[in-house]
């Protein structure tokens, strides 16, 4: 199983589900040890927390499980960001059971983002587009998917400041400043 090759399955790291007193899968999926016993007795199984776009577990519950450990890290601005407001689950982008999470890999990240951001895919097919298609740029080079205080989920406070990260020569002074 791939999950045993991920950052979530490190028994020597107390921050991970497998390093927290042996809770393992139940750390994220809730109590499930009695599933088989209850079925044998003719009782219904307690529902398990499931993750992803097609899961029957409410997105708020899915995200609460993830944010229980990750809220203090890269998702400080998650609450009230566009992904939160639009009820996008963490698992819609992240796959914690795979050794290589596609959204964290520069070459595959755009395809994960394009699942929802369909119009952006066509924009990056144009001749004059940034080199996302070629794997030289990822969505997260300019945008902060976990939320930000900047407009358009940018990694810097303004559009210009974000662009200047790569295009310092455009900083000016200019005869007419960019808007």
Predicted regions and their residues:
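Short sequence/structural segments immediately N-terminal
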Residues: 1-179
